[in-house]
From Swiss-Prot:
GO BP annotation list: ribosomal small subunit assembly; translation
Function (record text): Required for maturation of 30S ribosomal subunits.
Name of this chain's protein: Ribosome maturation factor RimP
Pfam families: DUF150_C (PF17384), RimP_N (PF02576)
Gene3D superfamilies xrefs: Ribosome maturation factor RimP, C-terminal domain, RimP-like superfamily, N-terminal
Family (UniProt): Belongs to the RimP family.
GO annotation, cellular component aspect: cytosol
Subcellular location as annotated: Cytoplasm
Keyword tags: Cytoplasm, Ribosome biogenesis
Main location (coarse class): cytoplasm
Encoding gene, per UniProt annotation: rimP
Organism of this sequence: Stutzerimonas stutzeri (strain A1501)
């Protein structure tokens, strides 16, 4: 996680948690002159649009006062959804046995994209089974990882 994301996580997660939600993860996406700050929230009872609005109002106030982002951006508060992104080792561990789609920052063993069964986590490596071949992907090389929802 970059130092900017760590700073945002440290600033925003306590606000989300004080409202009774889990801060699932934070993304900051640079899009030219305008960027996107996306905060994923979760709750045991699920997330409704009213929950997102409530958290967004609180986070907006904190962001206005603390001003941690020097460029123009849009704040988006969202549920992680069924194809939820994975951010932490604990989230990978909780989803062992699920199908995942992983994109790396740079090629590993000749490829950047992996789609398969999340077999486990070994220290700082994510174990993924793709076409009967097991890959140990260093978590710090993962750019993006999402659960592939099952509809059965």
């Amino acid at each position: 996680m970059s130092s900017k994301l760590e700073q945002l996580q440290a600033l925003l997660a306590p606000v989300v948690e004080a409202l009774g939600y889990q801060c699932w993860g934070i993304e900051f996406i640079s899009q030219g002159r305008h960027s996107l700050l996306r905060v994923y929230i979760d709750h045991a009872n699920g997330i409704l649009i009213d929950d997102c609005e409530k958290v967004s109002r609180q986070l907006s106030g904190v962001l206005d006062v603390e001003d941690p982002i020097s460029v123009d951006y849009t704040l988006e508060v969202s549920s992680p959804g069924m194809d939820r992104p994975l951010f932490t080792i604990e989230q990978y561990v909780a989803h062992v046995g699920d199908q995942v789609k992983i994109k790396l920052r740079s090629p590993f063993e000749g490829r950047r994209n992996f789609q398969g069964l999340l077999r486990g986590v070994e220290e700082q490596d994510v174990v993924v089974l793709v076409d009967d071949h097991e890959y140990l992907l260093p978590i710090d090389m993962i750019d993006k990882a999402n659960i592939i929802p099952r509809f059965d």
